[in-house]
Structures are given as C-alpha cells and as structure tokens.
Amino acid sequence: MKYKVLILTHGKLAGSLYDTVKFIYGSTDGLAYLNMPEPFDQSTYGKMIADIVSENKEQGTLILCDLFGGSPFLTSARLLKENGDHMELVTGVNLGMLLELMANIESAGIKELKDIALSSGKDGIIDMKERLGKQ
C-alpha cells in the first residue's frame, strides 16, 4: 500500500489518532501510523520507519511526529538526512491537522501537504477568550 502521510508518536497515540480520523473522515487511504513498540528498540523502530519511507520513494512520505526532540522525531530526523528528496518531517501532529491533510491527500504532493500541515496546525490553536473579545 502506498502512503503519503505517516503518524509517529509516543505510546499508542498514533493509532488512536488514526482510528479517530477513520471515525470522523471515513477513509484513511494514504495515511499510516506506527505505534512505538514496547519495549522500545531504536534500531527496530528505525527500520520500520525506513521500510515505509523506502516503499514510498516515488510519491514521498510526510512524517508527522508528536514532539520535537522525542524518539519518533529523532529517529525520523536521522532518516531525513538520507531521504530528504522524498521525505518531509513535521512535529506537533493533531487531529485537526490530520483531517485537513485527508481532505487534500489525493491531490497534493508531500511538499504541499507539509505546508497544509504547518498552517492547519498553527491555525487550529485558538485562544477562545481572545477570539470572543475581538468580535
């Protein structure tokens, strides 16, 4: 299966985000996830990620991680050095970001998907008191 977007997080958050996208959006075509294996083994985890990136070299892969500096991010950042031409990496994955990506996953390339992830991630953080005060 070809994937454009790969969710990587600590624990089982990646799978929960995936399941929630499927519940809300219906389709998860082009979306994949890897839960962090227990016990954690950097080498095994890195190989699992590398295999998905390698299988999708033609279209590329956008990797979404939960935290900058965490194990999913650090493992992916190492791969980015080797696969920069067909891989993008963004941290701060959230449900709103994933839903926006799913709406564009078939038509957009990974660089455009990266831009969508960045803007929707930032735009989805709202201070409601501030917003109400401006209206």
State where each predicted segment sits:
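N-terminal loops that bind phosphate or other acidic moieties
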Residues: 2-91, 95-135
